[in-house]
């Protein structure tokens, strides 16, 4: 498993032979409240973050968008696990599964995002991460999200088709937006360089 830093790229095809499916997991915890009242009343509030994925061609034109209101891509290759409203518990809070062999040939980029539909900022989030797991359950890459601040969205990472291989890049691009559509221009500028 490769632990990535911001703007680092890894070839997933080199990390896993016969790569056919990917599991993109996103996890987070609400910041624990400090002080007497925080301890008396549970210590934290729920944080509703939403994972999303934008399929794009080589120019950055959107082909499809997957998020909690559209859980499956038109081609059927990308499927969202559904909305986790709290961020509670260990492990992945939301998952996007990608069947690489079913992606249309014109899909060159997949941009993975997270945003707060409720408008909660990333000042209220800790221990956020994304990870990529192959079809055998092997974790190929992990990226710890450290982008705390008043923003409501992050373009987390991208997956790029590169001469038959798949390259995964940790982006960590903070932006504003309560929905994946609100973040569209930031997504394109972060992914297409």
From Swiss-Prot:
Query: InterPro entries, per this entry?
Result: Stress/Tellurium_Resist, TerD
- GO terms (BP aspect): response to tellurium ion
State whether keyword Mitochondrion applies.
Answer: no
Give UniProt keywords alphabetically: Plasmid, Tellurium resistance
Q: What does this protein do?
A: Not known; seems to contribute to the tellurium resistance (Ter) mechanism. Also involved in phage inhibition (Phi) and colicin resistance (PacB).
Instruction: Name the family.
Output: Belongs to the CAPAB/TerDEXZ family.
> What name is this protein filed under?
Tellurium resistance protein TerZ
Give the species this sequence originates from: Serratia marcescens
